[in-house]
Amino acid sequence: MRLEPLYRIRFTYPESWAVSLDGGWQQMFFIAEGRCEGAITGRFRGANFPRKEGAAGPFRPDFRAVIEADDGATIMMEWHGYGRACPPERRQVVGSVFHLADREPYRRLNDVVCVCAGEVRAPAIQVRPDRSGHRCGRADLGAHRRLTRWRAASRLP
């Protein structure tokens, strides 16, 4: 398998909320805003509903988002993954990304499974905590797609 870069998304979480759960887990909700650059270029907006194991534990991103492409197209995306909590200032994230688009040239992504790798960076400057007490940092996510298309085995004729 060979991968090729598809785009890079840089985003921030201007708002967030969190609920503490039994066993030290946390359920969080983040609003994401940013920019997508690469084969798809445009505005990025989304929501992340990750679950995190303790203050310094791993986390599971669960994103739904939209890219408003500069050419007017709308590309919806779904991203699931796993994040390592170390090192704290550059937490690492990997995952799978699925897209939905209703026009060319993006429609080809509808039956492609993309992989992503990225990092969550600690803010370079002091930022005020949001209403939940969390510091809102910056994330950098690169998505890659396989050169060959992948079709779901469960798709019925």
Language-model features: locations:
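N-terminal polybasic/positive-inside topogenic patches
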Residues: 155-157
